[in-house]
Every structure is written in structure tokens, then in C-alpha cells.
Amino acid sequence: MYIQILGSAAGGGFPQWNCNCVNCAGFRDGSLRAQARTQSSIALSDDGVNWVLCNASPDIRAQLQGFAPMQPGRALRDTGISAIVLMDSQIDHTTGLLSLREGCPHQVWCTDMVHEDLSTGFPLFEMLKHWNGGLNWNRIELQGSFVIPACPNLRFTPFPLRSAAPPYSPHRFDPHPGDNIGLLVEDTRTGGKLFYAPGLGKVDEALAEKMRDADCLLVDGTMWDDDEMQRRGVGTRTGREMGHLAQNGPGGMLDVLEGFPEQRKVLIHINNTNPILDEDSPERAELVRRNVEVAFDGMSIEL
């Protein structure tokens, strides 16, 4: 299985366009050793030719341009994108569909809850019908597994995650299973397994069991501290309120990952305020000590 990190930041990217926090300002003036990052998205393939896009970032055009296999050049109009899987209906994971309209129709896989949000509060399915049929919905059931025909050797097993629906969702304050999902993806030829959960608010034993079954854990790296945005003076909500488990503190993501010594551990969906973006920070050094990696745009993983 080929895994390509197209974008590794949380909403707004890094540096965020309107932010002058320590990280963003430091990156711009050159005092911070860090890499720029676009908003979170990955691509999966079983042959390196046909790719499943997991989430469609607002930065999708730049991400595709930066990854040559996404333009195989087999025809006058072409793309390496064979299907799209949506983990949720958040703006930073779905807006890129608008930029892909010239390639419609697209095969889009998502849950009932995500489809409802994207047909009502943020009606992308309706909007894009005007472009060659738009988006063809393939339902993701929360039980069992599914296979996408373009990548027949990849088996996708979805699981619901505890997180928040977006503000435009009809059930914003009434969470439903399927508002947000993670994926266990297995290459049935190599046996390699990826656990992918960019929005992860809580890890219970059932979820931990799925993590133990994987070779690589690509998980929520949004915030270092739960009150990080408050500390940085750029927001009032905590990570938990937004559906993200912070890395630091008792029961945080680093404590969770300590329980998986055999797996490769990679943080993704990193907020612009997170000190781990600073490659010289003590927080980044702590990740190195714990053998936890930080995803970056252009990172490639094979399982």
C-alpha cells in the first residue's frame, strides 16, 4: 500500500493566512525552523497509479500539482484520482471538491450523516450536479468493510469516532455515529494495515484494539495542550470541545501512543498553534524521544 501525505495541517494550514501567533510569525520572519503545511488530506493506492483521495482539502490543487502521480498524462484530460473518501463533512475536508468540478463525475464514499450534511447545510452534492453529473454517492456503512473497485487490493474498514459535526450540520449539537469516522485500511496482498484517524477525540478499548491491529497509526495531532488556543490568545475553545485529543497531559495522545510500541506512529492534522511545528522546540524533542513522527506535506509511507 502506498500512502502519500498531501496535506498535514489542520484547518487554515501553516502558517495560517490571518494568524500572527508565535509559530506563524516566526515562520514568516525566519526565526522558526519549520515547514509550511497545507490542510489535511492523504492519498492511498495499491499500484501507484490509481489513487483514493481521503478528504478533499481547500488546498487540493496545489497538493495535486506537488505529487506527480496525480497527473499520469494518459489522455487529454486525466487524473490519478479514482475515488474520494470523506471522513467527515468539515469545510477543511470537503471544500476541495469544488476545485475538482472539472473532473466530474467523481465516485465519493461517505456515511449517511456526511451525505446529509453535504446535501443540506453545505450542499456540495446539489451544487456539483451541474458539472457532468457531479458526485456519485457510495454509502459507507458503519458495520463491515468495503472495497473500492479502482484499488481492489485495499480493504477499508470504517469505524465511528467521537467528534463534533460542523456548525452547518442539522445535528451540530446532537452527535450521531458517522458524523466522523476513522479507517483501518489493509493491503490484502502485503498484509500491511493503516489506522487513519485525523480527528480523534477519545480512544476507548474498542478503538485501541483496532490500533493494535495496524502497522502504522496516522492519528490526530491537532494540539499539544487542550487549552492551547486560549494560551496562544487566538481562541476560546479547548481541543476536546472541538473533538481533538491533545498530545500532552494525563490520558493525552502521547500517553495513548505509549501503549503501541510495535507500531509506526505519525501525527497529522497539526494546528498552526502547536509547538511541535517548531523543529527546535522541547515538545518536538519529546516526540523524538517517544519515537513519534510528525507528518509533513510530501511524506510517503509504504506498507
From Swiss-Prot:
GO terms for biological process: pyrroloquinoline quinone biosynthetic process. Keywords: PQQ biosynthesis, Transport. Signal peptide: none annotated. Pathway: Cofactor biosynthesis; pyrroloquinoline quinone biosynthesis. May be involved in the transport of PQQ or its precursor to the periplasm. Belongs to the PqqB family. This is Coenzyme PQQ synthesis protein B. The gene is pqqB.
